[in-house]
Amino acid sequence: MSDAPVSSSAANAMWGGRFAAGPDAIMQAINASIGFDKRLYAQDIRGSRAHAAMLAAQGILSSRDAEAIGEGLLTVLSEIEAGGFPFRVGLEDIHMNVEARLKELIGEPAGRLHTARSRNDQVAVDFRLWVRDQCDAAITGIEALMQAFVAQAEAGADWVMPGFTHLQTAQPVTWGHHMLAYVEMLARDRSRFADARARMNECPLGAAALAGTGFPIDRHMTAAALGFDRPTANSLDSVSDRDFALEFLSASAICALHLSRFAEELVIWSSAQFRFVRLSDRWTTGSSIMPQKKNPDAAELLRAKLGRVLGAAVALFTVMKGLPLTYSKDMQEDKEQVFDAADTLMLGLAAMTGMVADMQANRESLAAAAASGFSTATDLADWLVRELDLPFRDAHHVTGTLVARAEARGCDLPDLTLAEMQEVHPGIREDVFAVLGVANSVRSRTSYGGTAPDNVRAQAARWKELLGGTA
């Protein structure tokens, strides 16, 4: 594809009736959006074909002209997809580039296509169609990643690992339970994209510049042709609304945040200090000077790249926050933010899916880490409540005292003798040691949503079924 220049006179042909001179070159550079909005070509052509068909059905356009327009637009589509379409900066945007080429192909009927339409409602429908398609793509990408996490959860339903708070060992959990935590996050992400898609599925085409049109158009016809549930109900809102883009960016930002959190965990877990996971060679790189290195570059790059999605959301909120109704040229700055966020998110989902599918948990390191750091202290406190009828606060104090003694001895809680424990509370019995093992600890967490292996297996099976059984 090329971005060919165009003369000022040609540039004015679309809107220049009241202008005596063409735009300054710098103005043209500021004004042109074809460098990025050419990505909307398929949606623009689809919207124009639906509009032409409706105009013909309403008797506003002859069937002969409508047929010529429809065939001409398909030719333009083929030219763009073949890679040889001469995009021209002077024609400003994708709408004018398509229309100008259509005029070259079919002549005078091309000028009738814009009847009862403005670029304001044209770009609104193009952009909505594109974002709607991206919601579908995001949902598909999220589901693939969910399946990868479910497969890990299914395999490691009873692999014990430490659960953390403040990045310090807190309580034993299972590998599968940790994997399913991300499935839950991603399920909410999927729901947010689905909700956003449902809300944006109204068609602004036919709102014209801002006030509607006096032509007897059928907005329900174009809405149905483009797969929308209904036409938008207020022409002012139709052309000034970018909530659909903001919602897409908001959902993308939260999803990116979730991906970034797991990327951070992969960086930590794959380090020599943790050795919780082995990352595939496909997702790591080496060092040019240190032969022993295997760097988690994919995870690190995602951790950084995904910040762009959050930045894009803030940028578009900033653009929109001070705009009066209806359309302002500021709104041309909406697309680059959405395009970049969508590209980054889709790359992140694909890369993370590959890393999760390929990673191997180091069960020995996980189990050893789970058994350290007094991870079953809460189990001891619970035992004191259940078996000795201590108030939990008293049990907490007794357990804390025992932890301090073990720490002073340089050992863990199971390494204390019964006599040492009875010095702190004489009611402690031999059977207390059963609750201090990490395997028993996770098996005991049978409350709904808890980390017990049977719970994990049940949840993994549930998600596998919900996701189509392909996990």
UniProtKB/Swiss-Prot annotation:
It is found in: Cytoplasm. The keyword S-adenosyl-L-methionine does not apply. It comes from Cereibacter sphaeroides (strain ATCC 17025 / ATH 2.4.3). GO terms for cellular component: cytosol. It is an enzyme of class 4 (lyase). Belongs to the lyase 1 family. Argininosuccinate lyase subfamily. GO terms for biological process: arginine biosynthetic process via ornithine; L-arginine biosynthetic process. Its EC number is 4.3.2.1. It catalyses: 2-(N(omega)-L-arginino)succinate = fumarate + L-arginine. Keywords: Amino-acid biosynthesis, Arginine biosynthesis, Cytoplasm, Lyase. GO terms for molecular function: argininosuccinate lyase activity. This is Argininosuccinate lyase. Pathway: Amino-acid biosynthesis; L-arginine biosynthesis; L-arginine from L-ornithine and carbamoyl phosphate: step 3/3. InterPro entries: Arg_succ_lyase_C, Argininosuccinate_lyase, Fumarase/histidase_N, Fumarate_lyase_CS, Fumarate_lyase_fam, Fumarate_lyase_N, L-Aspartase-like. PROSITE patterns: FUMARATE_LYASES (PS00163). The keyword Amino-acid biosynthesis applies. SUPFAM superfamilies: L-aspartase-like (SSF48557).
